[in-house]
Design a protein with these regions (language model features):
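Glycine-rich hexapeptide-repeat left-handed beta-helix
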Residues: 26, 32-34, 39-62, 70-170
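Short HxH-centered metal-ligating active-site micro-motif
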Residues: 67
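Long, hydrophobic N-terminal alpha-helical segment
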Residues: 14-22, 32
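Extended, small-residue-rich solenoid/repeat segments and analogous flexible loops
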Residues: 1-16, 170
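Charged, well-structured alpha/beta interaction segments
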Residues: 6, 25-27
């Protein structure tokens, strides 16, 4: 995992980052909500605006209960809560993804796209494929929380406690 500009990366807690994640906090602030799951080989790089011939980088906000599957490049300006981004997606500069959204695997979202709440997008380039029910917010929240709990449980099992190691030495 490579976290550049760590002082500019704010995590609310209960977040999981797998191996080979790159977060570019050295460019601009990155704010993560709770239960954000970032899987292998994901690059999170804040976006920029061009004004009067100069480039200004913009902070990135990622909401609660967000899962980003492996091999994605994320350059959005904001990702809402209860969002699932499939494997191999490219999220272009200044994209805004609202709450309760599903992005299918291998989707490419062009720069400056606004993804409305309760929608499914997929394809190259991304296009609207359908609506999600209001239940998706609870489904995505449960999935992210369960993933976190399982991840923490697996980590605890992988690290033997001091009492267990003493007992095995007796």
């Amino acid at each position: 995992m490579i976290l550049k500009g760590l002082e500019n990366i704010r995590m609310e807690g209960k977040d999981v980052m797998h191996s080979q994640v790159v977060m570019r906090g050295d460019i601009a602030n990155i704010n993560l909500g709770t239960y954000v799951i970032i899987k292998e080989n994901v690059i999170i790089r804040p976006t920029f605006n061009k004004k009067h011939g100069s480039v200004q980088y913009v902070k990135m906000d990622i909401g609660d209960n967000v899962t980003i599957e492996p091999q994605c490049v994320i350059q959005a300006s904001s990702i809402g809560s209860n969002v699932h981004i499939g494997k191999g997606c490219i999220i272009g500069h200044r994209v805004v993804i609202k709450d309760n959204v599903k992005i299918l695997d291998d989707t490419v979202i062009p720069p400056d796209t606004n993804i409305p709440s309760f929608t499914v997008f997929g394809g190259k380039p991304a296009q609207y494929l359908g609506e999600l029910t209001e239940a998706i917010s609870q489904i995505n929240a449960d999935l992210a929380k369960n993933y976190y709990r399982n991840f923490v449980g697996l980590q605890a099992k992988a690290e033997p406690s001091a009492g267990a190691s003493q007992a095995s030495q007796s």
